[in-house]
A protein has these predicted regions:
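Long, contiguous binding/interaction regions
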Residues: 1-161
Length: 161
């Protein structure tokens, strides 16, 4: 069973393409739509999508103009940035911005096709300087200060046992 990576994504561009992506996301086949692999194969999925399976639990909102979609979902083990890259290669008129947080494996990051940005950061709450290398926007967006406080409480409880 995988750790689940939480993802938040904004996709912008042609309204017809956004509608097609929306339909795929609601059918739990977003990644197959963005970067088709046909019959599922573990190695092909990881190489093409960056994750083992397609997404689960999508929450989709479309802006009124139909050209922007906001999407939250979980993916297995890590974010599907490879699928984003493959989609953008074939659809340069579209843009994808994403951020993600995987609490079990302790990493966070973001992707932005317009800025050619794809960065991941390790989270080590045991290091008092854990914030130093992580952009503040990511810390705020994913509530890492609260996560850190919860971690400290858990550590205190462990020490009391």
């Amino acid at each position: 069973m995988p750790n689940w990576c939480m993802n938040t994504v904004t996709i912008t561009g042609d309204a017809n393409k956004v509608a097609a992506i929306e339909a795929a996301a609601k059918n739990d086949s977003l990644l197959e739509h963005l970067a088709p692999i046909g019959e599922w194969d573990y190695g092909t999925a990881v190489e093409t999508w960056g994750t083992k399976w397609d997404i689960i639990g999508p929450d989709v909102q479309i802006e009124e103009d139909g050209k922007t979609m906001h999407l939250n979902f979980d993916s297995a083990w890590g974010p599907p940035t490879e699928a984003y890259e493959k989609y953008i290669e074939k659809n340069p008129d579209m843009s994808i911005e994403a951020s993600y947080y995987e609490s079990g494996m302790c990493f966070i990051g973001w992707y932005n096709s317009s800025e050619e940005l794809n960065e991941s950061f390790e989270i080590d709450f045991a290091d008092e300087d854990w914030r130093d290398d992580i952009p503040q926007d990511l810390i705020d967006d994913w509530g890492l200060d609260d996560e850190y406080e919860n971690w400290k409480e858990w550590q205190d409880d462990e020490d009391d046992d």
